[in-house]
Amino acid sequence: MRTVFVDLHNHSCLSPCGEDEMVPALVAGLHKLAGVDVAALTDHNTTRNCPAFFEAAQAYGLSPLAGMELTTAEDIHVVCLFLTCEEAAAFEENVYEHRVLIKNKVNIFGNQLIVDANDQVIGEDPYYLPNATTLTLEEAYDLATSMGGVCHPAHVDRPSNGLIAVLGDVPEHPAYRFAEFNDPANIEPYREKYPRLRDMQVIYGSDAHRPDAVPEEAVFSIEVDDEGTPAEAVFRYLKGE
């Protein structure tokens, strides 16, 4: 077994609420400097900056996962993670069919920049990314897991778009294995208040949208097996394998 530090929820300049300077290479570099072993890029309802993130992460010696912070029909955020960019892109193709396409108003919401590993802008998403899809909680979970990914509720300890904030409690279904916390200090108080969380394992995501939101030092670690890359071991851990 080995100890790995993780941060499995981060945004880039593709999310309109993310700072333009949050290019994938910077996200990767900041996590490497912080001592994180495995980091995931999880922009709102898209995975299109994951290739640049993977290229930069591998250059820096960071082990990456590809992901998406999907907004369900209930307006709840769930994190969907994949081992490869190709799997994540295939998932996004399916999610796109469930997006509600509203033109992005850059002057109000911000830019949605697709960039390469050299920080060059290669495109933009013209439609506002964070709004709710037509996928329900269960449909999003079923889609992600059927395509080889994992899915868990994002920032259950946050008042905005969190599972508990929206529903008032943790539902029986989907049968999530993990719950993501934004602040590890909230884990025990939330488990005390919401009994179903006691049956779920905990994972951490900084939900960083700007450089100074990435912790300067890694704050959350897990024990995983010794096989393969750190990202591969973390992914097996998330899948319960």
How should each PLM-predicted stretch be described?
Residues 40:
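Conserved Rossmann-like nucleotide-binding pocket used by diverse enzymes
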Residues 1-8, 12-30, 34-36, 47-90, ...:
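Charged catalytic cores and adjacent phosphate/nucleic-acid-binding surfaces used
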Residues 83-125, 168-169:
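Active-site gating loops and adjacent loop-to-helix segments of metal-dependent hydrolytic enzymes
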Residues 111-146:
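Alpha-helix-centered segments that form part of catalytic cores
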